[in-house]
Amino acid sequence: MTTQKTTHLTLDRILARIGAAGLRLDHMNAVEAGAGNISVSVTADAGELGLAEHLPQAHPGTKLPLSAPALAGRTVFVTGSGCRLRDIAGAPEANVSAFVIDDGGATGTWYTHPKREYQRPTSEFNSHLAVHNDQVERRAVGFQSVIHAQPPYLVQLSHMRDIRSTKELNRRILRWEPETIVQLPAGIEVLDFMVPGSQMLMESTVKALRDHVMVMWSKHGIMVRSDTDPLAAVDKVEYAETGAMYEVRNLMTGGLGEGVTTDELRAVARAFNVPTDLL
């Protein structure tokens, strides 16, 4: 998506899509209580979006958790720390705020609502901001959604030492439905456990999401990105989580399932012209 095509998204539309994504993740049991967070970056500024009408409290000069110079002049929406993602659809302004990034990227004007249900943005805001900045810097994306969630089957597999690698996790989740390789041709990059919100996790996530749309934070959750829509990012999670569900169920039944063979997956990839090096 080019930068010229992003400003047609109205503020109401952006908040509605964030809310819909939160509900879908909740239905997947991937965001228990206040877990999980969502951000969206767009090229539009406060005036184009009408931020002051929906989020009337402006806090200029708010320091960002890291410098994001590529985002200067852009707006980043982000969910609040401790907010339940399932509540966003019914009360978006209470659970989502927006930052319009200043020149230089060290600060921004933070737009909030008087009835906000949080004190600060999500504790993972550093990773969200870093991914947005890196993707804009490298690919000039005009719109991007980034989501962190904790899908139970994927997380469960990441607790298993013999599965906790990029090669093995992808082998396990790709073999249950032919659609999965089509939807996730690069698979999931698997990271070792790192402290949530840490500098190490942020840097590793930025690197992983350059070549993948989804990264596994072992024993914690996933982060996924989309250039089109928050729900498109959730779709990727749903495909991966379904594969993980089948794998867990197969393990519970003694590994009786054959799954889609590597040769069969290669045939699918050829038929749909899927560019992948996983097979």
Could you say what each language-model-derived stretch is?
Residues 1-279:
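Glycine-rich flexible loops
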